[in-house]
């Protein structure tokens, strides 16, 4: 099983969404250069800070979990670990798919220049992601595992998820 540590400062969303069936796991990268660690606070700031302050202005972060460089997995948004996506579990990872998805990101995904997409996963991150995906598939049979780039015109997660799954 994957060990996940909780992140502080969780803020639930208002309960105006209808609960939906979990249909997929979406794999993301943080679009940071190799070796740069990313914290839950970084993700929160990037995603929820007002646009005027350099953020995206979202109500919630884009990922359920974050895989750090050392392979540890940090929970950013708590969930019930069941097949239903409750309103407070919804993250903003892929427009049009969020109510039926969980999202995981690994720290990295771009070359040292900070812009060129590049699979920068460390061996520890690759192992953690493999265990995470295997656990997800075992717990939620029939749910898809996709890269963000399969749902939107993005390079994220900077590797071919379907080829990797084979």
Residue ranges and their predicted role:
Residues 49-61:
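Conserved active-site loop region of the serine DD-peptidase/beta-lactamase
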């Amino acid at each position: 099983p994957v060990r996940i540590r909780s992140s502080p400062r969780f803020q639930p969303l208002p309960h105006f969404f209808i609960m939906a069936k979990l249909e997929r796991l979406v794999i993301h990268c943080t679009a940071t250069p190799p070796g740069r660690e990313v914290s839950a606070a970084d993700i929160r700031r990037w995603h929820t800070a007002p646009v005027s302050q350099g953020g995206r202005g979202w109500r919630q972060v884009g990922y359920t979990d974050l895989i750090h460089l050392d392979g540890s997995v940090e929970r950013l948004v708590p969930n019930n670990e069941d097949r239903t996506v409750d309103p407070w579990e919804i993250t903003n990872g892929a427009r049009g798919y969020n109510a039926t998805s969980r999202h995981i990101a690994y720290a990295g995904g771009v070359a040292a220049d900070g812009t060129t997409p590049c699979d920068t996963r460390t061996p520890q991150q690759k192992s953690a992601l493999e265990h995470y995906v295997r656990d997800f598939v075992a717990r939620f049979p029939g749910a898809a595992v996709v890269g963000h780039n399969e749902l939107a015109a993005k390079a994220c997660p900077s590797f071919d998820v379907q080829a990797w799954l084979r």
